[in-house]
Amino acid sequence: MKHMFLPFILFFCSSNLMASDFFDAFKADKINSTLYVIHGPRETPNPKNRGFMNNPAFIVAEKSVVIVDPGSSHETGTMVLREIAKITSKPVSHIFNTHIHGDHWLANDIIQQSYPNVKIIADPRMIKKARAGAAQSWTDNLISMTEGATKGTKIAYPNESVSDGKQLKAAGLTFNIHSVGIAHSDSDIMIEYVEGSTLFTGDNVGYLRILRMSDGSFRDVIKALDRAISLQKKHYVPGHGPTDNVKIAELQREYFHTLYSLVVKYNEEGLEDFEMKSKIEAALVKFKNWAGFDEQLGKNISIAKLEAEKAEFE
């Protein structure tokens, strides 16, 4: 009888070893004296990356640790806790979630299991969407996209809301909240870490990664990027891709502004989305090698065209 279970046991052990090997390859990059970022893969969630594709970040304060976007799963959250433990034994007191998309925040639960009193902070729109079913939808989608790699991840909802203009103290540090309209997902906050001269942009900015806009507004995300650029911080942590300076927000604005303004132009000339694609692609040639360019360009043009047509009646 025991031999019947041997293939299952071997598969289970093999899967765990594969997960361990994958996550062991990622280390926290030190950005300044208090800030660390684990830069994730730039591909969309799949079995190989086990759903991990964002940039979990953490700040080591005087008495505790603040996490921003811990990632997509219990495995990603475990990796974040592992990297924190390499640097400090201080507890995690706060988690910021930048928006509703589950690749950024479904690791909340594994953090909360270790630190039950952790405050999980997000926009009220995100909290409402999560509790209305988006959290479960994202959990199910990630299981499907990764062929079961994220299975076992549970939902820990944000328990404190913040909106645009809010300044708060977390772990003795100062954070300003920036939110502009619908932007990337109609649930976004950008988090300005004042003492660290850092802006966590969420998915309002991707660097070397083209962002999907199926839940967003091109006009609002451009406004959000204008805000981000105006802050002139030393460090910008994007939702996906390497951390850098303000240039990554400027590049993201260039992509969105170029795409949307050309869609408006060609829409006024009577072109359909498929007819304008090659013209817009030529104008965005500098972004051609960014991850997701071919996959997202046509979709983004179609979404921008719908927004431009709607704007004609406003």
Positions of the model-derived regions?
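Divalent metal-coordination and catalytic microenvironments
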Residues: 34, 59, 69, 84, ...
